[in-house]
Amino acid sequence: MLEARQRAFAMIRPGTACADIDRAANGFLRQEGMGEYLLHRTGHGFGLSNHEGPWVADGSQDVLAENMLVSVEPGIYIPNLGGFRHSDTVLVTRDGYECLTHYPTDLNSLTVSTGKLFTRIRGALVRKAVGI
């Protein structure tokens, strides 16, 4: 999944067809035998809504332009196991892109288990209760 993300990043620049970015990212996942686990496009734009064009998707006619905001979020979803996705917000710049998301990509940071989730929720509730 992270390699698919890198393949999408490598293509982001003004003038790139969004369908080509999707083919690079999701094509890699298909090549690796993950095609049956793909449930959505590689990304989408942001603006007045959080899901709008340009659509980074197969069949999209959209082309990137400078100052567009797009998500890069290739993902695989395996029944009875879970989903794997890292969603990044990316600004298209004159010469390429700037990733506005700064989150670790190591496996431990990307793993959310039930235990970790409940610990986070409990911690948030305690902080709220004590006013911090």
Task: Please report, for each region that a protein language model flagged, where it lies by residue.
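Active-site neighborhoods and metal-handling regions in enzymes and metal-associated proteins
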Residues: 1-132
